[in-house]
From Swiss-Prot:
Description of how the protein assembles with itself and partners: Homodimer.
Organism (species): Mus musculus
Annotated protein name in UniProt: Aspartoacylase
Localization terms from the record: Cytoplasm; Nucleus
Lineage: Eukaryota, Metazoa, Chordata, Craniata, Vertebrata
Reaction catalyzed: an N-acyl-L-aspartate + H2O = a carboxylate + L-aspartate; N-acetyl-L-aspartate + H2O = L-aspartate + acetate
Gene that this polypeptide is encoded by: Aspa
Amino acid sequence: MTSCVAKEPIKKIAIFGGTHGNELTGVFLVTHWLRNGTEVHRAGLDVKPFITNPRAVEKCTRYIDCDLNRVFDLENLSKEMSEDLPYEVRRAQEINHLFGPKNSDDAYDLVFDLHNTTSNMGCTLILEDSRNDFLIQMFHYIKTCMAPLPCSVYLIEHPSLKYATTRSIAKYPVGIEVGPQPHGVLRADILDQMRKMIKHALDFIQHFNEGKEFPPCSIDVYKIMEKVDYPRNESGDMAAVIHPNLQDQDWKPLHPGDPVFVSLDGKVIPLGGDCTVYPVFVNEAAYYEKKEAFAKTTKLTLSAKSIRSTLH
C-alpha cells in the first residue's frame, strides 16, 4: 500500500507582481486583483495580491538600486534599517515583515511570484526544492490542466548557485515565468496563460484543503547545471551573440558540437563538453548585465507521494 503524506491545510497565500517593475503581466494582474479579487477568492483561503517593488513599477524598470529577487538572504534581511541601504534591501525587509519572517512558523504558507521573460520559455513553473511533495503535486496538477499547452518546470536547486528569491520567505515558494514578452510590454496571450496558471494553482489548493487525496505522481523537470556567459574579448566586451540555431530553442536538447554563438566575422562557437543539455533563458534581455547568455539544465524526473490535508 502506498503511503500518504498528511500535510497542514494552506491558509495564507500571497500573489506577488512587480518584483521586476518592467515585467508587466504580473503587475497588470495583481493591480486588477487588488481592485477586484473575485477571480482569486477561494473559500477558506486568505489570498493577498501585492505589488512588491512599487518604485520600479512606477518607473517601468527592473529595479531601482539592485535586483529585489536576489536579496532575500538572511544577511540582507537582518541588516540594520537605514536610508543608506539600497531601496530593494529596505523593501525586502518590509516584505519579510509583512509575509514572513523567512524560515518561521508565522510566514505565509505560499507565495506565487509572477515574472515575464524575453526568452521563448512559454509557461514555466520554478521549483526550489526537489523533495517537496506538495509542490510537485501542485505542478503536476497545473501541467495537466494547461495541456496541451506545454508547462515546463525549472528546478533551481544547486549547491553553489544561491538565488535568495522574493518568494523564498514562504513555506512553499512558487515562481511563475511566462514568455516570450518584451519588458515594458503587455501581450494578451501571455496574460491569459499566466492567469490560467494561477487559477489552476488556487483550484488545486482548494481541492487539497477540502480533503481531496492526490495519488502519487511524477513530473519531468529541468535542473540548473550552470550559467553560460557570452564570449568576450580582452576588454571584457561581448565578442559573439546567440547563434540563430539556438535562438528561441529553450527546453530543446542541445548537443555537443551544436552551434551556440556566432561572432561578427562569422566564427561559430559550438557547445563543448560531452553531454546533451537543455538551454533555458536563452538571450534573456535582463541577463546581459548579469553576463548570462543562457543556463544549461539537465532533464530528470521527480516523484511525489500521495498527499492529503490533515483536516480530513
